[in-house]
């Protein structure tokens, strides 16, 4: 882990491991006849965040033993009514980058607020990222993530001297 300077602010670079998620963001399920992210994107676009260039799924990156907290995200969309299958949800987004096998991909930390998403437990050591499709990536792969410490607090993180 290290602090790196990018443009006008600092980013924190964290090592992570790609984990399997609930799989509702990326594919249809018995409760959802579509991927949830595919259904949510038009709502986010109408609110000012265009995610259409990105893959219709999320990377679930474990940063254990660290934990993250979305503190001052670039975007927060309160109580988005994107489906009639459950109550409205609040979502926050913070720009990020992921690195895999020497390539860098821009994207967004995607944070469905757990207080409005009662049916899913949100692991505070698992960061969900929306980015471009990454060829060849598999569960268990090492993947680095850069996050903005002005928007996301990393609990247990100590910058290198």
State where each predicted segment sits.
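Anionic-ligand-binding alpha/beta catalytic cores of soluble enzymes and soluble regulatory domains
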Residues: 9-86
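Non-catalytic surface loops within mature trypsin-like serine protease
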Residues: 63-65, 113, 149
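Loop/turn positions that initiate beta-strands
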Residues: 140-145
């Amino acid at each position: 882990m290290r602090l790196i300077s990018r443009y006008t602010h600092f980013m924190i670079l964290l090592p992570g491991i790609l984990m399997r998620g609930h799989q509702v963001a990326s594919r249809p399920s018995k409760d959802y006849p579509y991927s949830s992210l595919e259904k949510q994107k038009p709502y986010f676009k109408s609110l000012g965040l265009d995610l259409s260039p990105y893959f219709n799924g999320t990377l679930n990156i474990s940063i254990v033993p660290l934990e993250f907290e979305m503190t001052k995200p670039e975007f927060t969309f309160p109580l988005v009514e994107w489906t009639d299958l459950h109550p409205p949800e609040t979502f926050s987004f913070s720009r990020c980058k992921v690195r895999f096998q020497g390539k860098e991909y821009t994207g967004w930390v995607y944070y469905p607020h757990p207080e409005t998403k009662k049916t899913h437990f949100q692991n505070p050591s698992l960061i969900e990222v929306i980015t471009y499709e990454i060829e060849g990536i598999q569960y268990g792969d090492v993947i680095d993530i850069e996050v903005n410490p002005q928007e996301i607090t990393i609990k247990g993180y100590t910058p290198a001297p």
